[in-house]
Amino acid sequence: MSTTKPTQQFAFDRRRFLTRSAQAATFMGLAHTAPAWARGADLHNGAIRAGFDEVSGRDIAMTIGEGPRVVQGRRGHAIAVNGSVPGPLVRLKEGQPVRLAVTNTLDEDSSIHWHGLLLPFQYDGVPGVSFPGIKSGETFVYDIPALRQSGTYWWHSHSGLQEQAGHYGPIVVEPAGADPVQADRDYVLLLSDFTPLHPHTIMDKLKKGEGYFNYQQNTWTDDYPLSGEDRRMWARMRMMATDILDVTGSTYTYLANGRGPEEGLEYLFNPGERVRLRVINGSAMTFFNVRIPGVKFWVVGADGQNVRPVEVEEFQIGT
């Protein structure tokens, strides 16, 4: 991930950097003025936007759609909510009810699951388990009573492979009382992955051959070939020695707030400010190791829950 170097009057304050988490922990970052993509500007000439807007209040409208998506010049198909990937940041308030009207404009069923939120079962958003799903052309209203929690979470589709196509976004539930984590700036960083291949194509290839996307397989001409004993061991396990992940960076482009590594992120901040960054892993199957070279920070929350602050140089966030 590339970053734009801040001007000289901006600098990291190592001892005051905060973190908080969603499906994980939180770490880096800081925007004095949000760049165009973070504000939802259309940089892709009519294609789905990168970055997300924010929705809040007692009545929230969300629309599920689809269209072309371009990441670092690679074009693919995307399912987006309110026209962007990730979809909008849903900002809620502990103790307050909310009505979320979700309209499905796809040609297939869809859904939204509110990951980590404690809700009546009929609003959990898992088709075939807690509700029938949202049919094409229909609107489903999640009429959620007063929320009983605060913290960082995320929402995503529970229909087919729509999540990998871009159907996901962040949730922040503000506490009813004073927030135990005080910060001058508070931002969301949603990590995910992108491929121009359709998710069903990836699934089809993996079902036909689990090593289809493994482009680093051992050969007899390797400088350090496996011994016969090692080869027999891997054969007994029915595994390849280089099978770290079913799909790796050879196929995926890894994203931060919908932007690829070459597209850049810029976070500006003022000296001495306390910054909280809420990190969410919205990827299909990727684990991220997060660090800021030369900077220590504090993990102050995990899975939406406040935790005793832990100073770290790096953390791993799963999906």
Feature map (PLM): residue ranges:
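Divalent metal-coordination and catalytic microenvironments
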Residues: 62, 100, 112, 157, ...
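Mobile cap/lid helix-loop segments that border enzyme active or cofactor-binding sites
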Residues: 66, 75-77, 191-270
